[in-house]
C-alpha cells in the first residue's frame, strides 16, 4: 500500500514538472535572460530595424494625404455637375403633378364613404335588435316558472305522505305483532330456552376460561418477539 502511494506521488510530480517547463517556454522567460547577455552588435541591429520601421509610416502618411486631396477634388467636380442637372427637373414635376392628384382624387372619395355607409348601419342595429330581445326574456320566462313549482309541487306531496302512510303503518302492523307473536313465544319457548341456556352458559364459561389462559401464556412471548424485531430493524 505504501509503495503504491509512492508511485502515485512520483508520477504526479513528473507531470507537474513537465507542465512547468512548457509554461516557461510559452512565456519566453529564457529569451529575457538571453537578451540581457546579448552583444552590442545585436543591439545596434535592433536599433536600425526600429528606425527603418519608423521611416515607413511617414512615407505612407504622405501618400495618404495625396490620395485624400485627389478624392476631395473629384467630389467637388461631381457636386458641381449634379447641381447643374437636378434643379431643372424637380420643380416641374412638383408644380404640375402633385396639386392635380390632391385636388381630384382625395376629397371626392372620403366624404361619400363617411356620409353614406357609417351612420346608416349603426342606429338600425342599436334600435331594432337589442331592446326587443331582453325584456321579452325577462318578462316571460322567469316569473312564470318559479311560482308554479313552488305552489304546486311542494305543499301537495308532503302532507299526503304524512297523513296516509304513517297512521296506517301504526294501526295495522303494531297491534297484530303484539297480539299474535308475543304470547305464543312466552308460552312455548321459555321453558325450552331455560333448559338449553344453562348448558350453553356452562360451555361458554369453560371456553372463556381456556381462552383467557391461552392469552395470559402467549402475551409474554408476543412481547419478547416484538422487542427482538424492533432491535433488528
Swiss-Prot record:
Q: Sorted alphabetically, which keywords does the UniProt record give?
A: Cell adhesion, Cell membrane, Glycoprotein, Lipoprotein, Membrane, Palmitate, Phosphoprotein, Repeat
Q: Where are the residues of the annotated region Disordered?
A: 35-219
Extent of Basic and acidic residues compositional bias: 38-53, 83-159
Protein location: Cell membrane
Low complexity: which segments have biased composition? 193-219
Q: Which domain of life is it from?
A: Eukaryota
Q: Gene Ontology terms, cellular component aspect?
A: extrinsic component of external side of plasma membrane
Bilayer disposition of the protein: Peripheral membrane protein
Tell me if Cell membrane is a UniProt keyword of this record.
yes
The answer to keyword Lyase applying to this record is: no
Which is a GO BP term held by this UniProt record? Answer: adhesion of symbiont to host
The record's region (4 X 8 AA tandem repeats of S-S-T-N-K-P-E-A) falls at: 162-193
Biological function: Plays a role in the adhesion to host cells. Involved in the adhesion to host apoptotic cells thereby facilitating their phagocytosis.
* Protein name listed in UniProt: Serine-rich 25 kDa antigen protein
Source species taxonomy: Eukaryota, Amoebozoa, Evosea, Archamoebae, Mastigamoebida
